[in-house]
C-alpha cells in the first residue's frame, strides 16, 4: 500500500463528535482541533451545527436519522434541511436498516431521493449503510439504490452499532459497486493509519 502524507490524510478525515452528552465547550474544542489539523470536515449532531459553523473555517457535516436510521423519511429530510440552513455543507444520512434487511429497495432509494431533494444538489449527501450487518448481496444492492437516489457517497458505518465499523472487504465491494464517480467513506473503528 502506498504511503500517504499527514496533510493528505487529514483532508479525508471528518473530525467527529456525535456523543449525546457532548457540550458546547466540547464542540468549540473540536473545531479548534479541526482548524489546527486542517481536516476535511467537522461532523457534529444537528443541534451543534450552528455553533460549529461559527467556530471553524472547516466545512461542517451533520448526521440525520442517527444512529439507528429508523426515523421517518420526512423527519430525515426536515433534519437535513435544518442542518443545511444552520451551516452544514455535508449530510451523513443513516439508511433505514429495516428496509435493507427486508430488501425494500424502492423505499431505500426513495428515502435517499427525498433527502437529496430537500437539501439540493450542492450539498454533499453521504448514506451510511452499517455494512457489518449485511451480506455481500445486501451491501451491493444498498449501494446501488443509494446512488440511484442521489447519494454522493456511500459510507460503511455510524461507529455506534455493535457490529463494529469499516472492513476492508466492505470498502472494496462498495468501491467496485459504485465506481469511481461516487465516493466511498470508511468510518467506524478506524483509529490509526494502520487501520
Where are these predicted regions, by residue range?
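Alpha/beta enzyme core
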Residues: 2-37, 41-42, 47-184, 191-195
Amino acid at each position: 500500500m502506498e504511503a500517504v502524507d499527514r496533510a493528505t490524510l487529514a483532508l479525508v478525515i471528518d473530525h467527529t463528535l456525535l456523543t449525546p452528552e457532548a457540550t458546547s465547550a466540547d464542540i468549540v474544542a473540536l473545531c479548534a482541533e479541526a482548524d489546527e489539523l486542517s481536516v476535511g470536515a467537522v461532523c457534529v449532531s444537528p443541534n451543534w451545527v450552528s455553533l460549529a459553523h461559527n467556530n471553524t473555517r472547516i466545512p461542517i457535516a451533520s448526521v440525520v436519522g442517527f444512529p439507528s436510521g429508523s426515523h421517518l423519511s420526512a423527519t430525515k429530510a426536515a433534519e437535513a434541511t435544518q442542518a443545511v440552513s444552520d451551516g452544514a455543507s455535508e449530510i451523513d444520512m443513516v439508511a433505514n436498516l429495516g428496509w435493507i434487511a427486508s430488501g425494500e429497495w424502492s423505499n431505500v432509494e426513495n428515502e435517499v431521493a427525498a433527502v437529496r431533494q430537500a437539501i439540493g444538489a450542492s450539498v454533499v449527501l453521504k448514506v451510511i449503510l452499517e455494512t457489518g450487518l449485511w451480506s455481500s448481496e445486501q451491501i451491493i444492492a444498498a449501494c446501488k439504490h443509494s446512488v440511484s437516489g442521489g447519494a454522493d457517497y456511500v459510507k460503511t458505518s455510524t461507529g455506534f452499532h455493535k457490529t463494529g465499523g469499516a472492513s476492508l472487504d466492505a470498502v472494496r465491494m462498495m468501491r467496485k459497486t459504485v465506481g469511481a464517480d461516487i465516493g466511498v467513506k470508511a468510518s467506524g473503528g478506524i483509529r490509526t493509519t494502520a487501520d
